[in-house]
C-alpha cells in the first residue's frame, strides 16, 4: 500500500435509494433502506478510499462491521455515507462511519478492512475450493 492513507482521511459517497436497496418483506408501504444494503454501501465506500492508496495487485476485504441502523430512509431519498480513517495498522485499516439522509442520521459505527495481495488471496480461495471439493467428493 502506498503511503498517505492516514487517520483523518475521508470519503463521502451519495446514493439514491431504489427498490434494490430496500426491504420488501413488510410490503410496499414499508419499503425502506435495508440494513444489509447500508452495510454493503459502507463497505464499498471504505474500499474506494483504500483503493486510492493501493498498489497494483492489491485490494481489501472486510474484517469487522459494527453499525447501528438508527432511522428509516425511504426509496427516492439520498443517503450520504461519510467514512473517516481512525487507524492504519500495517494492512489493517479502521474507519468511523456515518450515514445520513435528507432528514436524519440513519447509521453510525465502525468498519475494519484488511489490504490483501489479490494473487495470494486467489490462491487461498482455490486451495479452499479444492479442499471442499475433496470433502464433498
Report each predicted region and the residues it spans.
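C-terminal output/interaction extensions
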Residues: 112-137
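Residues at secondary-structure transition points
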Residues: 29, 33-37, 94, 116
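Short, residue-level hotspots on alpha-helical faces of the histone-fold
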Residues: 40-44, 48
Amino acid at each position: 500500500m502506498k503511503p498517505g492513507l492516514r487517520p483523518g482521511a475521508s470519503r463521502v459517497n451519495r446514493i439514491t435509494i431504489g427498490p434494490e436497496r430496500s426491504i420488501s418483506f413488510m410490503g410496499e408501504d414499508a419499503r425502506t433502506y435495508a440494513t444489509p444494503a447500508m452495510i454493503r454501501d459502507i463497505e464499498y465506500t471504505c474500499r474506494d478510499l483504500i483503493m486510492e492508496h493501493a498498489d497494483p495487485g492489491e485490494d481489501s476485504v472486510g474484517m469487522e462491521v459494527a453499525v447501528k441502523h438508527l432511522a428509516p430512509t425511504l426509496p427516492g431519498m439520498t443517503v450520504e455515507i461519510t467514512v473517516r480513517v481512525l487507524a492504519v495498522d500495517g494492512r489493517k485499516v479502521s474507519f468511523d462511519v456515518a450515514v445520513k439522509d435528507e432528514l436524519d442520521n440513519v447509521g453510525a459505527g465502525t468498519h475494519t478492512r484488511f489490504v490483501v495481495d489479490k494473487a495470494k488471496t486467489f490462491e487461498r480461495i482455490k486451495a479452499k475450493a479444492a479442499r471442499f471439493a475433496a470433502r464433498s467428493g
